[in-house]
């Protein structure tokens, strides 16, 4: 669910998901559109694709089980929403790995976005 997702982002990056990642670029936030080309936006594009491939969890706002082990997110092994958890984990880690490239000028990006990336 969004709260769990936000907690993963906060713990991995030290940044609150809002406003840092909610409106950044063209794929981040609700209803991502087309690629801006930033690394954070690429993380969001991959996350959107991950959600499209989910099979075990009916809705992307369902709760899942996870824990932290040695500073690593561990998704619940027997959880029917494990795939959803793995998608959220992947983007939180991607944001952390790209912290040095975060550019707040794209935080409230209102200009038209570039041509869409290849389909998932």
From Swiss-Prot:
It is found in: Secreted. The record marks 104, 107 as: Important residue of the cationic membrane-docking site (MDoS). The keyword Cell membrane does not apply. Residues 104-115 are annotated as: Important for membrane-damaging activities in eukaryotes and bacteria. InterPro entries: PLipase_A2 (IPR001211), PLipase_A2_Asp_AS (IPR033112), PLipase_A2_dom (IPR016090), PLipase_A2_dom_sf (IPR036444), PLipase_A2_His_AS (IPR033113). The record marks 111 as: Cationic membrane-docking site (MDoS). Disulfide bonds join 26-113, 28-44, 43-94, 49-120, 50-87, 57-81, 75-85. The record marks 63 as: Putative cationic membrane-docking site (MDoS). Pfam families: Phospholip_A2_1. The record marks 3, 10, 15-16 as: Putative membrane-disrupting site (MDiS). Snake venom phospholipase A2 (PLA2) that lacks enzymatic activity. Shows high myotoxin activities. Also has anticoagulant activity. A model of myotoxic mechanism has been proposed: an apo Lys49-PLA2 is activated by the entrance of a hydrophobic molecule (e.g. fatty acid) at the hydrophobic channel of the protein leading to a reorientation of a monomer. Homodimer; non-covalently linked (probable alternative/compact dimer conformation). This is Basic phospholipase A2 homolog piratoxin-3.
